[in-house]
């Protein structure tokens, strides 16, 4: 093993404890978490077993972080906890969502998509879909003011990265004539579904493709008697709400707070927890600093994209 490989191995280590895949990351502060926790069907009901196994390790990780899941919104365990937030649509019937939860302006956006010729349907994961996703990925190097990390990925990579959890996945395609112009992938997790990815061509943004995809997702969830459709977080750290939060609100997503537990396993972990060093920069930096920094990044990346298109 080279020195560089050894350094990488200390930054991330994966193994199983019982039925849960655990990943440990970090060098100065080693944090253990359940890998892909939001997408797993099982939730932690006996954290003491995982904690004792982690403490037996040499060296032991400094902190263990795990979360509860919908619909369990009240803390169950006697550990230090914070609240993470989700963007979720409570679902009863499609008609109830359409008439009572959705704002009139957003209903008009779904109608606008229909008038523009956009149709939506559940589709299979196959080579045709992979090629369509690749075309959407490669349209632009910048999305929502940040560098788009899927840009210029090759077909095998696109196929591999979108083939996760296929036994519990549903793909919805948005079509203009016969062309795929947008897609949504959601994963069924217990009694709710979680949006893993939703994306459409920027050149068709005047056709409300994303609104149409979400409407179809609600319809599918309602037909399966699911209780929630979850779309990532409602807000992120001290950045607060942004344009994406507003989009989610207009589509009837609400903020739901879920307990997240932060368990120190070492003296270093206890000190780090006291100093809140387990948090991300957007949780630590004040909003008055985060917002202008993000705005500067958006302007720079937009300028970069403009120069790239002109070249």
Model-found features: residue ranges?
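Non-catalytic accessory segments adjacent to catalytic cores
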Residues: 47-85
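Short beta-strand segments
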Residues: 63-68, 197, 230-233
